[in-house]
Amino acid sequence: MKKLIPALLAFSAAFPALADDITYAKHIRPLWDDKCERCHGTSAPPYEVFLKDKKTFELDDKGPRMDSYESFVFFLTGPQAGALMRRLDDGSNTKDGQPGNMYRHLGRGEQRKENLQIFKQWIGEGAWIVKGAGELSKDEIQKIKAAK
Ligand code: HEC
């Protein structure tokens, strides 16, 4: 037993945050409240309403509502699978090398990178795949952790 404890400590130091440790409730929601809520909160229209009048909502800085775990993962593993990765990527995984258009909302400078890292850890090892709408395979979607 005595030997096991240092081994465990070394293990947790090497992997400071495994995907299972990052949850929507503990890490993503507070980040979302800070960075995304003003345009995707309760005052934003549900997705199907948003789609009917995109232009008007966009002019008003309103995107589709994502104010619960369920409405958020809709853009991750649901009908809009992968949208979150497409929008938040910093450009290192996109075809044209340009960041997704929500990346800039993740904060300034270092904070932006750190917040992206939290999102990536939440999605899980190997699951941050940037592909077009409808292009993620079932296997790729199944890799997504996104713990509640
Ligand atoms: C200043 C307002 C604003 C902020 C802040 C903002 N968004 Fe957005 N977002 C929009 C608008 C408007 C759209 C719809 C237009 C578009 O598709 O680009 C959108 C679209 C999206 C989409 C695509 C939805 C779809 O149709 O598939 C995702 C995903 C997204 N945002 C995630 C986020 C996340 C995560 C954050 C916080 C890090 C965030 N946004 C912050 C305004 C914002």
Regions found by a protein language model. Name each.
Residues 20-148:
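Aromatic- and Gly/Pro-enriched helix-to-coil junctions and flexible linker segments
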Residues 2-10:
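Sec-dependent signal peptide recognition
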